[in-house]
């Protein structure tokens, strides 16, 4: 239960950070490109890489599981799930499963877009 509460609180903070950045981006819209979403995805991936890289070098003793859950699953998960997607792809590539990483990327993006358009189509047809 404690771990779930830590993830919940972290996700709230990550979501608030994302929302704040999106509010700033409303004033910085250039050429109709989603710059802030792009920045959030890249910065979240960078933060995940820094966190995982640090953990790999320092182990459990200096970084308890509860703090990992709060930061990685909670804060970064609330900020952007793209950081987890990037980490999972990097782990596949590091294990030599490049083909599986490409497949995961294509399936995730392709079916994600497909699911979104299906949802839009269904709700529009019901309106």
Curated annotation (Swiss-Prot):
Transmembrane segments: 28-48, 73-93, 98-118
Record's catalysed reaction(s): fluoride(in) = fluoride(out)
Keyword set, alphabetical order: Cell inner membrane, Cell membrane, Ion channel, Ion transport, Membrane, Metal-binding, Sodium, Transmembrane, Transmembrane helix, Transport
Localization annotation: Cell inner membrane
GO molecular function, one term: fluoride channel activity
Residues the entry annotates as binding Na(+): 77, 80
Covalent S-S links between cysteines: none
Signal peptide stretch: none
UniProt entry tagged with the keyword Magnesium: no
Any one GO CC term of the record: plasma membrane
Family of this protein: Belongs to the fluoride channel Fluc/FEX (TC 1.A.43) family.
Protein name: Fluoride-specific ion channel FluC
Lineage: Bacteria, Pseudomonadati, Pseudomonadota, Alphaproteobacteria, Hyphomicrobiales
């Amino acid at each position: 239960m404690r771990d779930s509460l830590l993830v919940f609180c972290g996700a709230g903070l990550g979501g608030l950070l994302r929302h704040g950045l999106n509010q700033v981006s409303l004033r910085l819209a250039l050429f109709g490109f989603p710059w802030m979403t792009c920045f959030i995805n890249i910065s979240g991936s960078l933060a995940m890489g820094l966190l995982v890289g640090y953990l790999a070098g320092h182990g459990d003793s200096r970084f308890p599981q509860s703090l990992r859950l709060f930061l990685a699953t909670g804060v970064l998960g609330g900020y952007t799930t793209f950081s987890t997607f990037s980490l999972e792809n990097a782990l596949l590539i590091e294990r030599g499963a490049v083909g599986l990483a490409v497949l995961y990327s294509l399936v995730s993006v392709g079916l994600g877009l497909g699911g979104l358009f299906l949802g839009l189509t269904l709700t529009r047809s019901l309106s």
